[in-house]
Regions:
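Short, charge-rich amphipathic segments
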Residues: 1-9, 48-51
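Short acidic-hydrophobic, aromatic-tinged amphipathic segments that line or gate anion-handling sites
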Residues: 106-110
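Amphipathic alpha-helical interaction surfaces in cytosolic regulatory modules
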Residues: 27-105
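Short secondary-structure boundary/capping segments
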Residues: 2-3, 12-14, 75, 97
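A charged, well-structured terminal subsegment
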Residues: 112-117
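STAS-typified acidic loop motif
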Residues: 4, 9-38
Length: 117
């Protein structure tokens, strides 16, 4: 039996001190990337010390999802708020490597390591 994949991402935000952790579940593509981007920018508006985006439950992301993360990164740099990505699944990690964005983003194996920085 094929496992159902969450088609629309669900983002849950929790706070670890001054650090915001955004845990995302589901695929991120053109049909939902605008909503995803809005959620990320709303977290930035709360002025966290850092933002960690937990992508461990995201099996697929297309270029629109990456564009949302790039927009967050651009705005966060202006606000001096570090953005870290954590838990990228193999398929998503490959996308970041192919586009060389693994050299642009801080990427960690899991949230614990990202928060330790």
């Amino acid at each position: 039996m094929k496992k159902d994949v969450q088609k629309r991402p669900i983002a849950a935000v929790r706070w670890e001190g001054q650090a915001a952790v955004v845990s995302v579940t589901g695929e991120i593509d053109l049909s939902c990337s605008g909503e995803f981007q809005d959620e990320l920018l709303d977290v930035l508006d709360d002025k966290p010390g850092s933002i960690t985006v937990d992508l461990s439950n995201v099996p697929h992301m297309d270029s629109s999802g990456i564009a949302s993360l790039i927009k967050l990164l651009g705005r966060s740099r202006k606000a001096s708020v570090p953005v870290r990505l954590a838990g990228l699944q193999k398929r998503v990690q490959s996308l970041f490597e192919i586009t060389r964005l693994d050299k642009v983003f801080e990427i960690y194996p899991d949230v614990t390591e990202a928060l330790a920085k």
